[in-house]
Each structure stands twice: as structure tokens, then as C-alpha cells.
């Protein structure tokens, strides 16, 4: 399975199943995404913050857990990125607003923590428009995110970086947010599946 070009586009559930069945390793899977990020993200600007070293360390630990036969979370080892507006410890949370350029989160948001508890390897953040208030994804902190199907077009917003990261095969799963179509709009523009989450999920 590890040589298939379709792997980066598998669903999170498919990836988690492959990890459990030892068809692919957690570090091996992460490195596939990191290679694609290096190749494609410069033109897309979907992922705007990342900690590859910490992610590799986490992936190695996840591989050891699989090998040891430990109880695994439902998304064990699946690489994940998350919308910039969600707090993740040590990562910037600016909402694309220059006034908060130097702000870094001191703890995880509920969404981030629940995904981590489910076993994901959260390794980066994705771009948004200023204050999450537009159907495009440009801000003065991180610049513009481009549609993976046509770089001259918008990926939508406000979860534009999220939609692009999924469509371009840069991540295994994403978390966005939606009040006024902020998931629905980028999902449509980028050709991916988007679902509005609920607080109890």
C-alpha cells in the first residue's frame, strides 16, 4: 500500500485501518504528506505553520504503540492539520489579524484536544481570511491561499486552507469551522467532503 499514489487521498478512516493492519507505518505515512507539502505547498500556501520534527517524534511513538499491541485510538497515527483559528499549544493563533501576529496558544482548544485524544498526529495549521470573515483565504499575516485545481482562483473561505490541504493530499484529516458556510464553501470550491461538526461530537 505504501507505494500507491492514492494513499495521501485516502479517508482518515481508511488510513487508520491501514495503520492498524500494519499496511503502512505512522512515520512512513507522515513522511508522505511532508514530501507533498514540500513539493506543493509553496504554490498553494495552505499550511502556514508546521512542526515536522515534533510530528516525526510523535509518529515514531505511534509506531511503537502499534508494534507493542497497545490499545489504539480510532484515528491512531493519522496525520492532521487544523484551521489556524483553533488553539494548539505552541502554535500561532491570529485569525489572520496582524494585531495578533505574535500570539501563541498556551493550551489546546476543545476540538484539537478531542482529535489528539482520538490518536491523530496534529502537525500543522491551515490558512484563513482576516478574522474568518470572507469567502476567500487571504490575510496580511500569511498571505493568500490558492485553489489546487487552478492557482488563479480562490479556494473559498473561511476554512480555505483546510479545503486545499485535503484536496491537494497534504493532510489525512482536517478540522475547520462553519457559521456562514465556512466549511461548505471551501469544500465546494475545492471538491472535497466537508461536514459541519457539532459540540457534542
Annotate the PLM regions.
Residues 63-86, 120, 125-127:
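Glycine-rich, aromatic-flanked loop segments that form ligand/cofactor-binding clefts
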Amino acid at each position: 500500500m505504501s507505494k500507491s499514489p492514492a494513499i495521501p487521498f485516502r479517508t482518515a478512516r481508511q488510513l487508520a485501518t491501514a495503520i492498524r493492519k500494519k499496511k503502512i507505518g505512522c512515520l512512513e505515512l507522515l513522511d508522505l504528506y511532508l514530501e507533498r507539502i514540500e513539493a506543493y505547498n509553496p504554490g498553494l500556501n495552505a499550511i502556514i505553520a508546521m512542526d515536522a520534527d515534533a510530528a516525526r517524534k510523535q509518529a515514531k511513538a505511534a509506531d511503537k504503540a502499534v508494534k507493542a499491541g497497545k490499545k489504539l485510538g480510532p484515528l491512531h497515527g493519522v496525520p492532521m492539520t487544523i484551521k489556524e483559528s483553533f488553539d494548539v499549544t505552541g502554535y500561532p493563533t491570529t485569525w489572520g489579524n496582524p494585531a495578533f501576529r505574535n500570539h501563541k496558544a498556551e493550551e489546546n482548544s476543545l476540538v484539537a484536544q478531542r482529535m489528539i485524544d482520538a490518536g491523530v498526529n496534529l502537525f500543522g495549521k491551515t490558512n484563513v481570511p482576516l478574522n474568518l470573515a470572507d469567502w476567500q483565504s487571504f490575510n496580511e499575516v500569511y498571505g493568500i491561499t490558492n485553489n489546487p485545481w487552478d492557482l488563479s482562483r480562490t479556494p473559498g473561505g473561511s476554512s480555505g486552507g483546510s479545503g486545499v490541504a485535503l484536496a491537494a493530499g497534504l493532510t489525512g484529516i482536517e478540522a475547520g469551522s462553519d457559521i456562514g458556510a465556512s466549511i461548505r464553501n471551501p469544500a465546494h470550491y475545492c471538491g472535497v467532503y466537508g461536514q459541519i461538526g457539532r459540540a457534542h461530537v
